Curated annotation (Swiss-Prot):
Cell compartments where the protein resides: Cell membrane
Highest taxon, organism lineage: Bacteria
Note: Bacitracin is thought to be involved in the inhibition of peptidoglycan synthesis by sequestering undecaprenyl diphosphate, thereby reducing the pool of lipid carrier available.
Protein name, as recorded: Undecaprenyl-diphosphatase
EC number: 3.6.1.27
Family the entry assigns: Belongs to the UppP family.
Signal peptide coordinates: none
Molecular function terms, GO-annotated: undecaprenyl-diphosphatase activity
PANTHER family, per the entry: UNDECAPRENYL-DIPHOSPHATASE (PTHR30622:SF3)
Residues passing through the membrane, by range: 2-22, 44-64, 85-105, 113-133, 163-183, 188-208, 223-243, 255-275
Length: 279
């Protein structure tokens, strides 16, 4: 029944809206949830769905940060306009590694890593990394506390960290936040740049998935279009709340709790995978 599929779409949209911005892997969570709750659709649509519903989350970022990201915003001074263009240039530079590495390798990683065990391992590894980095930085002051002071070189290397998210379970936001902190930015700068970098990255990735879906000879029926729209709209609404939460959270807390969550979840998934294999 279509109503059941739409309820599932709402549920997946909630998962996407929350996990896209928290450093816990949205794609990984969608794959995991679909181990137990699946859309009654073909595999090609589900693979495309898992990526394209990110558009709702991206539109939420664009809405929240529209004035800050818009160089033509009325009332901006010449200096503010210059800083906005510089920010966009940093974002473009940070996209280069993904264009050169992640895009060509995407199909290979999708074929070999979109399974429970690789996701669980990635969750645990990056969970440990978050805890270790936060402990290492506990007594250190970040070198970059304003986005305007972040160099183009730092932006490029943050983009290199983003490439790591090609492995499901890594988390795009987790990889870029972790990379930015390692490179000396404050948590606030790391989170902000992660939000901004998501706009071209996820628009491009979603677009590529959609184009590939149609070039492979697939098409969307009315029910599938409705499922995508409902899931994306849900992801948009939930993302508005998740982004506000994370921006407020990082002002007072570190990312250790997310590291612990990743380790616990990854460990449970390894146990589940073991028993599923044995029995």
């Amino acid at each position: 029944m279509l109503i059941i599929e739409l309820l599932k779409a709402i549920f997946f949209g909630i998962i996407e809206g929350i996990t896209e911005w928290l450093p816990v892997s949205s794609t990984g969570h969608l794959i995991l949830v679909q181990e137990f709750i699946r859309l009654n659709q073909d595999k090609a649509f589900i693979e495309m769905f898992n990526i394209v519903i990110q558009l709702g989350a991206i539109i939420a970022v664009m809405l929240i940060y529209f004035e800050r990201l818009n160089p033509f915003q009325p009332g901006k001074t010449a200096r503010e306009v210059q800083l906005t263009w510089q920010l966009w240039l940093k974002v473009v530079i940070a996209c280069i590694p993904s264009i050169l590495i992640a895009v060509p390798l995407d199909n290979w990683f999708e074929a070999h890593f979109y399974f429970m065990v690789p996701i669980a391992i990635a969750l645990i590894v990056y969970g440990i990394a978050f805890i270790w980095i936060e402990k290492r930085n506990a007594q250190q002051e970040p070198a970059v506390t304003e986005l305007a002071r972040m160099s183009y070189k730092t932006a490029f290397f943050i983009g290199c960290f983003q490439v790591l998210s090609i492995v499901p379970g890594t988390s795009r936001s987790g990889a870029t936040i972790l990379g930015a902190i390692i490179l000396g930015t404050s948590r606030t700068v790391a989170a902000d740049f992660t939000f901004f970098l998501a706009i071209p990255t996820m628009f491009g990735y979603s677009g590529l998935k959609a184009v590939k879906f149609f070039l492979d000879g697939h098409h969307l029926d009315f029910a599938q279009v409705l499922i995508l729209l409902v899931a994306s709209l849900t992801a948009f609404v939930v993302s508005l709340l998740a982004i506000r939460f994370l921006t407020d959270y990082v002002k007072k807390h570190d990312f250790t709790i997310f590291g612990k969550y990743r380790i616990v979840l990854g460990s449970l998934l390894l146990i589940y995978s073991f028993f599923k294999f044995v029995f």
